[in-house]
């Protein structure tokens, strides 16, 4: 039995953009991470994170009411197939561990104050 992981054309455009973005913008950071250091790396990815947010791809694992995209598991899997090609890509897209798991727990069980502060 074959599984069909095709998606609608609009989302496929996002995936195509992600693939190119990761290859052209994120992979090069891997070669200079040691030179940048942690703080320099955060500064370097900040504008990339803004581009991801502008494309509507930030925190895809969270529902929209909590600042995410709520894309569902199949689309999230397709995204992670691309993001998994770089150790830094999940951070640029707002779904790096452990933050992604912690945010999901807060989304399900956090108080309104915790959700407001951390999500």
Features from the language model and the residues they span:
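Short, compositionally biased low-complexity segments
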Residues: 1, 20-23, 93
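Intrinsic disorder at enzyme termini
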Residues: 1-15
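Solvent-exposed alpha-helix faces
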Residues: 16-19, 84
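Glycine-rich flavin
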Residues: 28-119
């Amino acid at each position: 039995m074959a599984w069909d992981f095709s998606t609608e054309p609009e989302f496929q455009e996002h995936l195509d953009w992600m693939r190119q973005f990761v290859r052209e913008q994120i992979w090069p950071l891997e070669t200079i991470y040691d030179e940048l250091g942690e703080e320099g790396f955060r500064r370097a990815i900040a504008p990339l994170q803004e581009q991801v947010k502008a494309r509507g791809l930030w925190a895809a694992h969270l529902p929209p009411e909590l600042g995410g995209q709520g894309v569902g598991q199949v689309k999230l899997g397709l995204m992670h197939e691309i993001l998994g090609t770089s150790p830094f890509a999940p951070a640029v897209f707002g779904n790096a561990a452990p933050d992604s798991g912690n945010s999901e727990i807060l989304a399900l069980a956090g108080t309104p104050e915790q959700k407001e502060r951390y999500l």
